[in-house]
Amino acid sequence: MTEIETLRRDPYAVYARRILRLKALDPLLRDPGAAERGTLFHAILHRFSASGIDPRDSGAVDALIETGQECFAEAALPADVEAVWWPRFRRLAGEIIEWESARIDGIVLRAPEARASKTVVGASEATLSGYADRIDVLPAGMADIIDYKTGSSPSKGQAHTLLSPQLVLEGALLRRGAFADVGPLQPADLAFVRLKANGEVLHESILEHDRKAKSAGDLSEEAWARLEKLLLHYRDPQAGYLSRALPFREAEVDGEYDHLARVLEWSAGGPGESDE
């Protein structure tokens, strides 16, 4: 599911990875970065949610910190990295429990790391699968889908306008019963929970943006229809895979496959230049 945004923004990258089967080599020497931090914090929250501990218990914060210690030990981070990341997590721990406690009464079931089975996308005959960071089942056949974020990307606006459709597509899969852990449900809210460096935990619904609101169901179906249209386009053997169709930043040309697409060479020339 994570590659759907790539297919929109940089189709050539999907072509190189999935059709040419080219995979970028890992750097020989590289310190853990933002992606690894996000993975680690996700693992802590997943393990804590799966434990079934009531966040209203007096020892909930200590239990979360203990879970964090376990996950940090397993990650075996370089000392200088842990010296920055661990205090950041400690600042978050109390706020996470406060956020959990504020919403626990309305939750029937917490399903962390819920897996969506392969689901056919309309007439395209292609399938979509993936994971949701967390699904909170509510009464009356409803559920909230939560996506933890340790950074600022994607923005609420990018998700609402479907430039970054992953969370919304999870809503479409939920409606289609793709998540076996919870069964077919209607999405009530689609939200990022941002774990900020200053210790703030921000629950950010993507259902409203620029004074325009849509229901989770309507937004999910719109994303599903757009995905079907996109996949049908690429079923045409004559359809090309454009490089950097909708790049995040025009000036950045350090994508894994940008050198294969000769991005620098194609962007070096300007209007009016000739081969003379």
Place the predicted regions along the sequence by residue.
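RecB-family 4Fe-4S metal-dependent nuclease core
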Residues: 1-276
